[in-house]
Amino acid sequence: MKIGILALQGAFAEHAKVLDQLGVESVELRNLDDFQQDQSDLSGLILPGGESTTMGKLLRDQNMLLPIREAILSGLPVFGTCAGLILLAKEITSQKESHLGTMDMVVERNAYGRQLGSFYTEAECKGVGKIPMTFIRGPIISSVGEGVEILATVNNQIVAAQEKNMLVSSFHPELTDDVRLHQYFINMCKEKS
């Protein structure tokens, strides 16, 4: 099994460490050639936290947006954390256009931003159990479509969800010692292969 990690910007190295800890090979995807070269070998894709506007621009500049979108729509399992969640959203409240736009949800950028600051909590995540959650100016999921399963909420806000082959979290599971959400994603990848 090999998981691709979008490595344009953001917390990609931390995800690679978690996958290594779980005995799963990972590859950093920095440009279209990397993605096309490894695409047929990939069991899944991680879109890490970072700055979503910058990542969206880099995806477009590197001509990676449409090929990644097509792969996700064709069933490639994807795990978007924080900015990665924003990249997957069909609608972003503060922007006119989405990026990949594959997951039926509306998100609000930086909802856990300046007004609330970064914070840590623990909460139940369906199919995983009670897990630590680190929020760093994270987004919230304002609403989801019928096909989206809500996996976790904090203070009545949706912070983790799944739609078919797409898993998202507002928080950064790669910044804790708890690997269960990554294991959940690996299990999704195994089911698809």
Curated annotation (Swiss-Prot):
Involved pathway(s): Cofactor biosynthesis; pyridoxal 5'-phosphate biosynthesis
InterPro entries attached to this UniProt entry? Class_I_gatase-like, PdxT/SNO, PdxT/SNO_CS
Signal sequence, renumbered to the chain: none
Name the chemical reaction catalysed here.
aldehydo-D-ribose 5-phosphate + D-glyceraldehyde 3-phosphate + L-glutamine = pyridoxal 5'-phosphate + L-glutamate + phosphate + 3 H2O + H(+); L-glutamine + H2O = L-glutamate + NH4(+)
* Keywords for the protein's UniProt record, in alphabetical order: Glutamine amidotransferase, Hydrolase, Lyase, Pyridoxal phosphate
Give the domain of life: Bacteria
Give me the disulphide-bonded residues: none
Q: What is its EC number?
A: 4.3.3.6, 3.5.1.2
| Family affiliation | Belongs to the glutaminase PdxT/SNO family.
Protein name (Swiss-Prot/TrEMBL): Pyridoxal 5'-phosphate synthase subunit PdxT
Q: Which gene encodes it?
A: pdxT
